[in-house]
């Protein structure tokens, strides 16, 4: 193979978590209650001014925020209104999904915690969107804002201009003041069931031309602890480790998990009272990287 072609292929590679990031609400796995509520709200025209998305890392908070911003600003030749049904890529969709649309402003509250950052937002909300229907502010890790910053935001949240929407995301909802929560429609994004994660990884494996053993996918799904992003990252690592054939043995070694049969052997030694053999087996498993 031409080395230049190989380099180009490598340069074009995207990690699985980005390559298979959902682009509409139908792609959000395990979040059906939220999707149902938003579908009804958009269909009836009862669209909130602010949303609070909460959940553990990797369940899709930022992705949901971008999809929601896309739905609010959806515009095609046939559709020019907010909608959950986004079958085609609209005028603003690609830029919003890639986080580069001028009217969808993303801010990481972890690095913009002060009142000055919020004052800048308050000054900007007066102005109409440049090209989209709504100016959407996505504030990630909103719990990191200072008390002053939260207080400065309250008035704008209470009476925002009709062309402005706020979407907040947080992993620590208890740190968000109740005065802010009461002004938002709250969605608790669930940990994704391991069976759903396993099924989705199998689908990705098929698209990527990767053969993955069921036990390997099951171990990855359990290790992800409800986070699809973590599952995709681990799967990515497993593919890099084993190539186009991901085995349970390789994943077990990569994750530092004990072989089930060896765990049973350890317990059998203990039940027999053979402490020396049990300690030897324990040591052997520890040396191979198993988590004690």
Residue ranges and their predicted role:
Residues 2-5, 65, 85, 92, ...:
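Extended, largely alpha-helical regulatory/partner-binding modules appended to the mid-to-C-terminal parts
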């Amino acid at each position: 193979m031409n080395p230049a072609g190989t380099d180009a292929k490598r340069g074009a590679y995207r990690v699985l978590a980005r390559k298979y990031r959902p682009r509409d609400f139908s792609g959000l796995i395990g979040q059906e209650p939220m999707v149902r509520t938003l579908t009804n709200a958009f269909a009836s025209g009862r669209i909130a001014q602010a949303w609070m998305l909460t959940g553990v890392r990797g369940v899709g908070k930022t992705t949901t925020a971008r999809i929601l911003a896309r739905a609010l600003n959806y515009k095609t030749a046939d559709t020019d209104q907010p909608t959950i049904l986004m079958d085609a890529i609209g005028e603003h969709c690609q830029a919003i999904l890639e986080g580069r649309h001028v009217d969808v402003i993303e801010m990481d509250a972890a690095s913009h915690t002060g009142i000055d950052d919020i004052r800048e937002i308050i000054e900007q909300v007066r102005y109409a969107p440049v090209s989209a229907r709504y100016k959407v502010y996505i504030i990630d890790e909103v719990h990191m804002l200072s008390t002053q910053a939260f207080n400065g935001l309250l008035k704008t949240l209470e009476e925002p201009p009709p062309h402005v929407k706020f979407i907040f995301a947080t992993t620590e909802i208890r740190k968000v003041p109740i005065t802010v929560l009461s002004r938002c429609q709250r969605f608790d994004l669930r940990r994704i069931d391991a069976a759903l994660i396993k099924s989705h990884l199998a689908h990705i494996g098929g698209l990527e031309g990767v053969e993955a053993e069921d036990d390997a996918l099951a171990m990855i799904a359990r290790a992800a602890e409800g986070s699809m992003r973590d599952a995709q990252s681990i799967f990515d690592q497993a593919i890099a480790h084993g190539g186009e054939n991901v085995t349970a043995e390789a994943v077990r070694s990569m994750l530092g998990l004990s072989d089930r049969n060896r765990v049973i052997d350890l317990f059998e030694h203990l039940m027999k009272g053979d402490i020396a053999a049990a300690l030897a087996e324990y040591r052997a498993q520890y040396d191979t990287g198993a988590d004690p």
